[in-house]
């Protein structure tokens, strides 16, 4: 005797497909947020490295030109003391297009207000010390 077996169709139901799409959407939203945050942290670190380079170049310029505390300098004064392999050394601007300078010997370069505000969610004020 032959038993009756219902024909089972292969494939996924609409509900199963919608659940998978919802899970993928949630994972991509989380990943996108983390990528954007990591990018901003990298921008903050790069800006801080640029400020340190400028500070060293300003010190070299001041020693070579016999400048003392309180004397001012422009970016063009310290530019020859920077490595020319990065955008900051060529343009005199940070990643947000803000100009570096003028500088004062012994106080060094400062992070611009625009850059500080743009990166404040990943780099608090203590991060920028002594360049704030």
For each of these PLM feature ranges, what is it?
Residues 1-12:
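N-terminal leader/signal peptides at the extreme start of proteins
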Residues 10, 28, 71:
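Flexible coil/turn residues that form the inter-helical turn or adjacent wing/linker of helix-turn-helix
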Residues 18-34:
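Alpha-helical hydrophobic helix detector
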Residues 21, 48, 55:
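Conserved catalytic core of two-component sensor histidine kinases
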Residues 25, 36, 41, 60-63:
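Terminal, compositionally biased segments used for targeting/anchoring and flexible tails
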Residues 29, 51-57:
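Conserved beta-strand->loop/alpha-helix structural units within folded catalytic cores of enzymes
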Residues 34-51:
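Aliphatic-rich helix starts adjacent to a transmembrane/signal segment
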Residues 56-59, 63-132:
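Extracellular/periplasmic head regions of type IV pilus-like filament subunits
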């Amino acid at each position: 005797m032959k038993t009756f077996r219902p024909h089972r169709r292969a494939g996924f139901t609409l509900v199963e497909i919608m659940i998978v799409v919802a899970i993928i959407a949630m994972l991509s939203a989380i990943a996108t947020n983390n990528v954007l945050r990591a990018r901003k942290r990298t921008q903050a670190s790069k800006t801080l490295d640029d400020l340190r380079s400028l500070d060293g170049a300003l010190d070299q310029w001041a020693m070579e030109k016999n400048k003392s505390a309180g004397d001012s300098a422009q970016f063009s004064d310290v530019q020859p003391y920077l490595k020319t392999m990065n955008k900051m050394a060529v343009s005199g601007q940070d990643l947000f297009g803000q100009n570096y300078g003028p500088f004062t010997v012994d106080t060094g370069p400062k992070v611009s207000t625009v850059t500080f505000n743009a990166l404040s969610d990943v780099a608090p004020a203590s991060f920028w010390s002594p360049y704030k």
